[in-house]
């Protein structure tokens, strides 16, 4: 083990340090001037930064413009009076004929099952706008398919002749999007489906407030039957239950009996009584003379009918009666097609039944890879409270296809606004949009629970993509999609007495070619009738065939410019992210904070070939603005990984020739935030308030847990086992507990300006955990010369990969030293321009004197260095 034979006094050592520092500084200053890093380069760098910033600002401005373009506005161009279908811009139209695929199903009423109504043609029109769409024709092949329950001859008609069917596709005017390159345009396919009819009766006195006695034990039911046990609720299917009842004993006015439905059935159908105390009035039970024998109500929550006798039964015996009531599916309790228990309790007597629901599939659309597909159902209409609300469920892209430029239109009418009581507007309509995780788990009944884990609400993502620019229409821009969505509509209708008619339309293109325009629509209608009962008018009707597909301009028109996509808002430059530690052998954690005007991101790695095992993990989160000029001529092999995300404001001139492995952490709110892991043989000159002149030779394996507040008052609580030779001229308050194999155990608290020469042979096997928190708000001048001639042979090569913001004095900027030639790639323009070397832009004539002066300074520094080395050699000798 090498020992320090001689050691200079503090004064001499201090002088030699300063002399060596001057020599090193002279070399650096001379080299700097010699190589001509002058003011002009700094100016050029600043100009380049300005240019870059200007470009960035311009890009931001362009982004703002694009954002403005992205938001559709009404009446922004002269073409806004044209219908959406006119915006197909059918350039390069295929001359081949395309099949017309029209599927039509049944419309229903809310009258009893025997009443049918024929719907109007299901052409998608908007009669609210004054402008008319240009009549256009396209040769297509007719392939019409009509499905209904009363006609089984679903014929497929195909002709070789070119049928020019001019269909008016009056979608909302001034659509906020444009379908470009319509190729192979599919004919709009509209499927008409009315939801189950509404079970509505004339307003009667509620029997819910029955105050008499439950006389279920005095009532006997008989001849129970269900009209049918299999039907399609999505095609207005329902059934009726009929039963006779006999009162076997005397009853009086106010007495009542009950009937209860199972979970799979409801008595109210799609009528919503949640705003009417969840109570539905039922038609009175009357005698042949028209006298009211009993009044009835239906409790929505308990699914219980209550029949309350009137004073007609007073003093009467052998009372007989019968009732027939419509029954509907419970969409929530029977969400899938299948057979369910339908056990009905009448006057405490159970009638066991089975009911089978064959829901027509909600997955419908154009049968081609990028065909539009959408369906909907009205699942609740408030007809009793006067609030005039309805609820609708819409399945968007239930086939889960890859679609481009997808738009969905939710309309409060079908063909003509004046023929529907629906109201769709920003004030009358509330939309909630959900993304479906697993399409196979969607219900067949259109019931969608917002709390279902299979649904993820994404309404906030569509806040700026829902438009109410057209009368009675909500337009939703889905864009390019691959998933299925559920839209829950809470709407209103007026009290004009018209049927509630709604329509949903989806249109899209092939996302790959931006062609192959496709459109598909779906109609719903609820017919409300007040009468002597309630029924689910689910009768099958033959709707008229919709007229053919969208008008297409036979003349090729130029391809429209693609719809601008919104540029992301310019985001502020992110904070510099600290580079990951490459796993140093050290573990110190410093959470320090300093106030800085600049940001330096130093990512340094050093490799230490030493016997000192420093296990530190330093995490310095400081901010400083370093206005410093530092020249580190170090030969250190440090196995350290310091990640400093710091901004230091230090006005220091440090010249370190260090051969060290130090694990230190300083948080300087003042002038420097240095986070190093090194074993230092350092000669540093820092402009600080404390002047520490120490020469220590430590052959130690120490881990220091120090908490120093360097206003150059350091309080070090260390546990070290050291073979050290230290000479400190410092203002230090050291509370040290050193355990050395050299028979010295010192627990001292000293404030010393001491000259200690310890030549000890100690085997230090210490393990200390350094958790230091140093807060230096100081101006310190540290002149230290530490020579570690220890068992840690640090013949090191320090590799510093740093990215720092440095503003040299006098506008001089130095290229960072990079011994190993590694490059740090930064994403910030400001950092790149400050670290990349720039070409010389100044006048060469101005650098002539600077070159001469630099050479002289370098020579002077070399002489001083040589003198120092010689003196050191003599001292060692």
Curated annotation (Swiss-Prot):
Q: Where is this region: Disordered?
A: 44-192, 530-849
Q: Bias category Pro residues: which stretches?
A: 545-555
- The region annotated as signal peptide is 1-44
Per the record, where are the segments of Acidic residues compositional bias?
556-801
Localization per record: Secreted, Cell wall
| Compositional bias of kind Polar residues | 44-61, 68-95, 120-189, 805-816
Q: Kindly state the positions of the motif YSIRK-G/S signaling motif in this protein.
A: 15-26
Propeptide residues are 842-877
User: What is one term from the GO cellular component aspect held by the record?
Assistant: extracellular region
Family indicated by similarity: Belongs to the serine-aspartate repeat-containing protein (SDr) family.
Indicate what this protein is called per its UniProt record. Clumping factor B
Q: Cite the source lineage.
A: Bacteria, Bacillati, Bacillota, Bacilli, Bacillales
Q: Which gene encodes it?
A: clfB
């Amino acid at each position: 083990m090498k020992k320090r034979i001689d050691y200079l006094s503090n004064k001499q050592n201090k002088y030699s340090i300063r002399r060596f520092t001057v020599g090193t500084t002279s070399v650096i200053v001379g080299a700097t001037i010699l190589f001509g890093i002058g003011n002009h380069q700094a100016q050029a760098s600043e100009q380049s930064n300005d240019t870059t910033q200007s470009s960035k600002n311009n890009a931001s401005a362009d982004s703002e413009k694009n954002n403005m373009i992205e938001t559709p506005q009404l009446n922004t161009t002269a073409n806004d009076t044209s219908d959406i279908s006119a915006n197909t811009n059918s350039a390069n139209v295929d001359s081949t004929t395309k099949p017309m695929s029209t599927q039509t199903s049944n419309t229903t009423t809310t009258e009893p099952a025997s009443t049918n109504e024929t719907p109007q043609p299901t052409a998608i029109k908007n009669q609210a706008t004054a402008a008319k769409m240009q009549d256009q024709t396209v040769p297509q092949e007719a392939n019409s398919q009509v499905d209904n329950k009363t006609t089984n001859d679903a014929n497929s008609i195909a002709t070789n002749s070119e049928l020019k069917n001019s269909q008016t596709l009056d979608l909302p005017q001034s659509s906020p999007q444009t379908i470009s390159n319509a190729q192979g345009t599919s004919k709009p396919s509209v499927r008409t489906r009315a939801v189950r009819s509404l079970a509505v009766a004339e307003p009667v006195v509620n029997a819910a407030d029955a105050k008499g006695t439950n006389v279920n034990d005095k009532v006997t039911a008989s001849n129970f039957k269900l009209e049918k046990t299999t039907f399609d609720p999505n095609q207005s299917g329902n059934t009726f239950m009929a039963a006779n009842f006999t009162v076997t004993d005397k009853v009086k006015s106010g007495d009542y009996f009950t009937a209860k439905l199972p979970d799979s059935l409801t008595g109210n159908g799609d009528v919503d009584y949640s705003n009417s105390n969840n109570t539905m009035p039922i038609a009175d039970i009357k005698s042949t003379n028209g006298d009211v024998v009993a009044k009835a109500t239906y409790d929505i929550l308990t699914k219980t009918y209550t029949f309350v006798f009137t004073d007609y039964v007073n003093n009467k015996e052998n009372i007989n009666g019968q009732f027939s009531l419509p029954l509907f599916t419970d969409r929530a309790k029977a969400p899938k097609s299948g057979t369910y228990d339908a056990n009905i309790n009448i006057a405490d007597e159970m009638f066991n039944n089975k009911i089978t629901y064959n829901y027509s599939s909600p997955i419908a659309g154009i049968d081609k890879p990028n065909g539009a597909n959408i369906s909907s159902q009205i699942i609740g209409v408030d007809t009793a409270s006067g609030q005039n609300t309805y609820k609708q469920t819409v399945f968007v892209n239930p086939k889960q296809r890859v679609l481009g430029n997808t738009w969905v239109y939710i309309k409060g009418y079908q063909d003509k606004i004046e023929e529907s009581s629906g109201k769709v507007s920003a004030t009358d309509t509330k939309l909630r949009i959900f993304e479906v995780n697993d399409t196979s788990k969607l219900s067949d009944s259109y019931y969608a629970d917002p709390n279902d884990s299979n649904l993820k609400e994404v309404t906030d993502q569509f806040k700026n993509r829902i438009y109410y620019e057209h009368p009675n229409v909500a337009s939703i821009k889905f864009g390019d999609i691959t998933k299925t969505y559920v839209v829950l509509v809470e709407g209103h209708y007026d009290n004009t007495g018209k049927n509630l008619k709604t329509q949903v339309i989806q249109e899209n293109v092939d996302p790959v070619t931006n062609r192959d325009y496709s459109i598909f629509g779906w109609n719903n209608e609820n017919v409300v009738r007040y009468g002597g009962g309630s029924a689910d008018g689910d009768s099958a009707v033959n709707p008229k065939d919709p007229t053919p597909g969208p008008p297409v301009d036979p003349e090729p028109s130029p391809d429209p410019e693609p719809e601008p996509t919104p540029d992301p808002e310019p985001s502020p430059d992110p904070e510099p992210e600290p580079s990951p530690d490459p796993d140093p052998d050290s573990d110190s954690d410093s959470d320090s904070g300093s106030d800085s005007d600049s940001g330096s991101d130093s990512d340094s790695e050093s490799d230490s070939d030493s016997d000192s095992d420093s296990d530190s993990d330093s995490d310095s989160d400081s901010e400083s603005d370093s206005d410093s000029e530092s020249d580190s001529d170090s030969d250190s092999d440090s196995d350290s990984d310091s990640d400093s995300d710091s901004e230091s404001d230090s006005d220091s001139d440090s010249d370190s020739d260090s051969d060290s492995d130090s694990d230190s952490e300083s948080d300087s709110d003042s002038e420097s935030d240095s986070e190093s892991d090194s074993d230092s043989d350092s000669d540093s000159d820092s402009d600080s308030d404390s002047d520490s002149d120490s020469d220590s030779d430590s052959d130690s394996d120490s881990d220091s847990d120090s908490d120093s507040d360097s206003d150059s008052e350091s309080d070090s609580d260390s546990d070290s086992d050291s073979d050290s030779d230290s000479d400190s001229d410092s203002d230090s308050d050291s509370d040290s507990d050193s355990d050395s194999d050299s028979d010295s155990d010192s627990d001292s608290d000293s404030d010393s300006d001491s000259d200690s020469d310890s030549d000890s042979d100690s085997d230090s096997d210490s393990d200390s955990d350094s958790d230091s928190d140093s807060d230096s708000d100081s101006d310190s001048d540290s002149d230290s010369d530490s020579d570690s001639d220890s068992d840690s042979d640090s013949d090191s090569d320090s590799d510093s990969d740093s990215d720092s913001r440095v503003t040299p004095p006098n506008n001089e900027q130095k290229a960072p030293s990079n011994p190993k030639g590694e490059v740090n790639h930064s994403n910030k323009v400001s950092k790149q321009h400050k670290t990349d070397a720039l070409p010389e832009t100044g006048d060469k004539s101005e650098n002539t004197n600077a070159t001469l002066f630099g050479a002289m300074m370098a020579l002077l520094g070399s002489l001083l260095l040589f003198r120092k080395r010689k003196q050191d050699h003599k001292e060692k000798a």
